[in-house]
Amino acid sequence: MEELNNVLIVKLSAMGDVIHALPVSYAIKETFPSAKVTWVVEPPSLELLKMNPCVDRIILFNKKNFRSLKGFMKEFFPFKHELQEQSYDAVLDLQGLFKSAAIAFFAKSNIKLGICNMREMSDKISKPVVGENAEGHIVERYLDTARAVGCGVNEVVFPIQIPVEQSEKARAIMEHAGIREGNPYVVFVVGANWPNKRWPTENFAALGDWFYHLAVVPVLIGSGDLDEMLAKEIESKMEIPPINLVNQTNIQQLAHVIRSSRLVIGGDTGPVHLGAAFGVRTIMLMGPTNVERNGPFGQLQHAIEVERPCKGCWKRACPKKEICLEKIPVSFVEEKIKSMG
């Protein structure tokens, strides 16, 4: 592969998926320092991507605006124009779906590659890269596409730089909530998009009480109405109320809260993966997804899998109407924490 000057990455959402793809941009810059990296992303992960110093240009793709004919006619041509302002030496479709294939189709490039498991006919546009990690962790699968265009991957680096002003605002929010600089605290990620990725609120509450007895403060994080409701349920079930930061921070401030914590605990969801990306000790509670593919990168030994024969089913909601992660008792998590030292 010749020198790369312009590379387009298509990885649209969600937060955890975008985090997993960040090392690809680092690998490109590490191998081709003068390369310009453009990334197409959807609004939910925009502020996360802005913290990536390895991305030179961000193109925003707002899928919602394309759902009506009027919206499509208004948005398509400006988006296409921005996408085609330059040609690319390579296009890497790390989403592997119809919507990302459509973006790759309109991008001007002779080399279009995708991940090993392309879906929705996206492999008709971008050639799947079936590398040595095709059965491995999703981070390594993404990196196989970088290797395919000549990138050396000497180490896996998640390039994330939190703006100083956002860290300062996060500190102020935390202090106002009762967490002073230097106070030890752990982060509970209370929700997840998939219902069966959520640990029961009574379990979080019991674990929070256990931490308080160790003089460690539990901090609840999340966003949206559902996470707010879950956090209130946890609060109501605890002996001492936790620090509740749900809906109190933006993504960049949340990143500071996570990076400064002693431990992050939650299901297979974006903020938990962010903890692993920062190298913070991370315990991931897993049911419908696979540890080897989706566990906390670099800390797979800290994942706790549910003891069910159907684990790794990849279903958003349990067809048996069972609460998947309730089979992970609080005592399992406490023992895992003790084993971490």
Where are these regions (language model features)?
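Catalytic machinery of carbohydrate-active enzymes
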Residues: 1-341
